[in-house]
Amino acid sequence: MDVTIQHPWFKRALGPFYPSRLFDQFFGEGLFEYDLLPFLSSTISPYYRQSLFRTVLDSGISEVRSDRDQFVILLDVKHFSPEDLTVKVQDDFVEIHGKHNERQDDHGYISREFHRRYRLPSNVDQSALSCSLSADGMLTFCGPKIQSGMDASHSERAIPVSREEKPSSAPSS
């Protein structure tokens, strides 16, 4: 059996006339010019770097920080209101679920849903957890860490999502 080996420089996901990143997770965000230029976008795909204007958090990717004093989850949920979000803690996990029904936008009808689950460190004080949504759509889940002599309770409970009027200023590491 003959197998054709192509250098990654010449690989194209759907052929030379289709952008290779149309099906990324940026649904409803629109396209940039380089998304529609197949020779620029798919020809250099293994070495391609996204525009500097799109940050990691713009892509819906969460950021988890755990330092000596607290545990923090930052998640971009700009397409959801606090009523669309459910945050609950069960045992050693925090579950964040977002869903909004089909609604009309500039391009037609769209519905979104996500479900994220994170393991909480064993020394997080589950009775003091908080969750807030900034004006720019950044969900911040915080939990202070307890001293080693104290015992953390492990039961299921919902964490209310409060709305902040100011944009998120992500705490520095």
Curated annotation (Swiss-Prot):
Listed InterPro entries: A-crystallin/Hsp20_dom, Alpha-crystallin/HSP_16, Alpha-crystallin/sHSP_animal, Alpha-crystallin_N, HSP20-like_chaperone
Biased composition (Basic and acidic residues): 153-167
Region (Disordered): 149-173
Residue ranges of domain sHSP in the record: 52-162
Modified residues (N6-acetyllysine): 99
Annotated PROSITE patterns: SHSP
Annotated region (Required for complex formation with BFSP1 and BFSP2), positions in chain: 1-63
Residue(s) carrying Phosphoserine: 45, 122
Chief location category: cytoplasm
Cellular location(s): Cytoplasm; Nucleus
Keyword Transmembrane: no
Binding site for Zn(2+) 1: 100, 102
Binding site for Zn(2+) 3: 154
Acyltransferase as UniProt keyword: no
Disulfide bridges in this chain: 131-142
Residues modified as Deamidated glutamine: 6, 50, 90, 147
Glycosylation: residue positions: 162
Modification(s) after translation: Undergoes age-dependent proteolytical cleavage at the C-terminus.
Entry-annotated residues carrying Deamidated asparagine: 101, 123
GO MF term (any one): unfolded protein binding
Subunit structure: Heteromer composed of three CRYAA and one CRYAB subunits. Inter-subunit bridging via zinc ions enhances stability, which is crucial as there is no protein turn over in the lens. Can also form homodimers and homotetramers (dimers of dimers) which serve as the building blocks of homooligomers. Within homooligomers, the zinc-binding motif is created from residues of 3 different molecules. His-100 and Glu-102 from one molecule are ligands of the zinc ion, and His-107 and His-154 residues from additional molecules complete the site with tetrahedral coordination geometry.
Similarity comment: Belongs to the small heat shock protein (HSP20) family.
Protein name: Alpha-crystallin A chain
Organism of derivation: Loxodonta africana
Classification lineage: Eukaryota, Metazoa, Chordata, Craniata, Vertebrata
